[in-house]
Amino acid sequence: MKNISLFIALRYFKSKGQGFISFQSGMALAGIAIGVAILILVTSVMNGFERELKTRILQAIPHASIQGNISKTEVEGLSESLMLNSNVLGIAPYIETQGLLSSGTYLKGVYIFGIDPKYEKNVSTIEEHFIEGSIDSLQGNGYNLVIGDILAFQLGLTVGDSVNILVPETSLGLAGILPRTKKFKITGIFSLGAPEIDQSYVYLNTDKASKLLRIGESVHGIRIRYSNLFNAKDYIRSDL
């Protein structure tokens, strides 16, 4: 009984005297087989692409953050305390704001992140996704900036070009109250394969970010990377 459907199908498929019908059956069967094979292939490719994209994004962003104005001396003490937890793989101070990136006549709204490259490697794999320059280019005295490849394409930018960053904080000058602005040099371009990041995120050094925002010797918080992202809530509760 289990093979009755297969038996009937094969009988009609192999039947003699109806060559044209048998040919049609063969073509139909081949078409279905090819269609199913293509569907399986496309589904596998899409699932693999989605998995790779999620992995890239999750590895490039921290699992948790402690927010609040924290002095750089407090960062060291807090970091030492957090690292006592065996589930904490790394920590990194950060500064975060929003602003405008200006290049010639083009303006683009961006998320601005001040990071310390030395610590950022402990919470993010973004350094592995640079197509030009590196995250280490943010170290040093220059006002350097790294951006995503989509943003670079949209504004026609490459390594070595200069851009202006405008932030909502204001400065009082001869012309009155103006948005605070500073010129930066593009020293790196990354590509995570995630459009929401590659076209909207820019990174600079925490020292330059604190000067731009005039927040003194402090940061906006600490980002944390755990051994298991999906247990991050439990780890945070234990740390607190």
Predicted regions and their residues:
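Mechanotransmission and gating elements of multispan inner-membrane complexes involved in transport
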Residues: 169, 177-240
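Short amphipathic alpha-helices in soluble, non-transmembrane regions
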Residues: 78-83, 126, 235-240
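Short aromatic/hydrophobic contact patches that present stacked aromatics
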Residues: 63-65, 144, 221-223
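Short acidic/glycine-enriched loop/turn elements at secondary-structure junctions
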Residues: 89, 98-184, 211-213
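Hydrophobic, regular-secondary-structure patches
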Residues: 37, 41-111, 121, 132-141
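N-terminal Sec/SRP start-transfer signal
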Residues: 1-36
